[in-house]
A protein has these predicted regions:
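N-terminal regulatory/effector-sensing and dimerization cores
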Residues: 1-96
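Short hydrophobic/aromatic patch on the recognition helix
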Residues: 56, 183, 187, 231-232, ...
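Basic, amphipathic alpha-helical hairpins
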Residues: 110-118, 133-141, 155-168, 187, ...
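Short coil/turn motifs that cap or connect alpha-helices
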Residues: 179, 194, 227, 242-245
C-alpha cells in the first residue's frame, strides 16, 4: 500500500517520487484514487486495458480496482485518496484527465494539509471542491482497451509488438480467419472504437514516452509506421489538441516556470 488511509474517512493526500523503471505491483485501494503526474510519465494497467499518464495529466481509479503502475523517467506522483461521495460521480471507470491549474493547486494544498493540525471542516470542503473540479475535467484519449475475442487478441497482441504494422482489416482477416466486416463489428462491440481508432491510440501511447525521453519527432513517426512527419503530427494534434513540438515546448515552458514541483 502507498499510504495509510485516514481513519476519519476524509481525503488523504501523499507526495511520492520514483526513479525511472520503478514498478508498483498489482494492488487496490478501498477509496477512489486520483494520480497526478507532476513530472514524468506513468503507465497504469488493469485487467481491462492500459492507460498512459503523461506529465501534467492525471488518472482516476475507482475504488477496489486492481492495478499496477510502471514509471517512465523520473516520476513525481501526487496522489489523492478520496472516499466515494454520497452523490454519484460520472467517473465510474478509469480515465486519463487533463488537469487544470486550479486543480493542481488544490492537490498541492491537500498534500500540505497532511502536515498541519486537524482541519477537518476545511478538508471536507476542499474534498468537495476537488471532486467537483475532477468531474468536469476533459478526458484524454490515452486508454488502450484489450479485447476478449481470441481473433481480436491476436491482432492487438501483434500490434503491441509491432505498432508500425500497416495491415488493413482485410489483411488481418486472412491471418485470423474472419471477414473484415466481422472484425470491425467486434472492435465496435468489445472496445467501443474502430480498428483504426484503436491503432491510432496505440501509436499515441507508444509515441509519448519516446518523445519525452528525447527521441525526435521524425524518428518516432518513422518507427510507428507513418509515411511522413506531417501525418504523425496530424494524428497527434487530432487526439491531443496540439502538435508534438507544441506539446513538448509547453512542457519545457512549464518546467522553467515552476523550477521544480513541490
Amino acid at each position: 500500500m502507498l499510504t495509510e488511509h485516514r481513519p476519519d474517512g476524509l481525503l488523504a493526500a501523499i507526495s511520492l517520487d520514483f526513479p525511472d523503471g520503478h514498478h508498483l505491483g498489482r494492488h487496490f485501494h478501498p477509496q477512489a484514487q486520483f494520480l497526478y503526474a507532476a513530472r514524468g510519465l506513468m503507465r497504469l494497467a488493469t485487467h481491462h486495458g492500459a492507460w498512459v499518464i503523461p506529465p501534467t495529466r492525471a488518472v482516476w481509479i475507482p475504488p477496489r480496482v486492481e492495478h499496477e503502475i510502471f514509471m517512465s523517467g523520473e516520476v513525481h506522483m501526487r496522489t489523492l485518496f478520496i472516499e466515494q461521495p454520497e452523490t454519484p460521480t460520472p467517473l465510474s471507470d478509469c480515465c486519463v484527465l487533463a488537469v487544470t491549474p486550479l486543480l493542481r493547486e488544490m492537490i498541492l494544498r491537500a498534500i500540505h494539509l497532511e502536515s498541519q493540525p486537524r482541519l477537518d471542516d476545511f478538508r471536507q470542503r476542499l474534498q468537495g471542491l476537488i471532486l467537483s473540479e475532477i468531474a468536469n475535467l476533459e478526458r484524454m484519449p490515452l486508454y488502450l482497451p484489450m479485447p476478449r475475442d481470441r481473433r481480436l487478441q491476436a491482432i492487438c497482441q501483434a500490434l503491441l509488438k509491432q505498432p508500425e504494422l500497416g495491415l488493413t482489416l482485410d489483411d488481418w482477416g486472412l491471418r485470423v480467419g474472419a471477414s473484415s466486416r466481422t472484425l470491425a463489428r467486434l472492435f465496435a462491440q468489445e472496445l467501443q472504437m474502430s480498428f483504426h481508432e484503436w491503432r491510432q491510440q496505440l501509436r499515441l501511447t507508444e509515441a509519448l514516452p519516446r518523445l519525452l525521453a528525447g527521441d525526435s519527432v521524425q524518428v518516432v513517426a518513422r518507427d510507428l509506421g507513418y509515411g511522413s512527419t506531417r501525418a504523425f503530427s496530424s494524428m497527434f494534434r487530432r487526439l491531443l489538441g496540439e502538435t508534438p513540438r507544441d506539446y513538448l515546448g509547453r512542457l519545457e515552458q512549464l518546467a522553467r516556470i515552476r523550477g521544480r514541483e513541490d
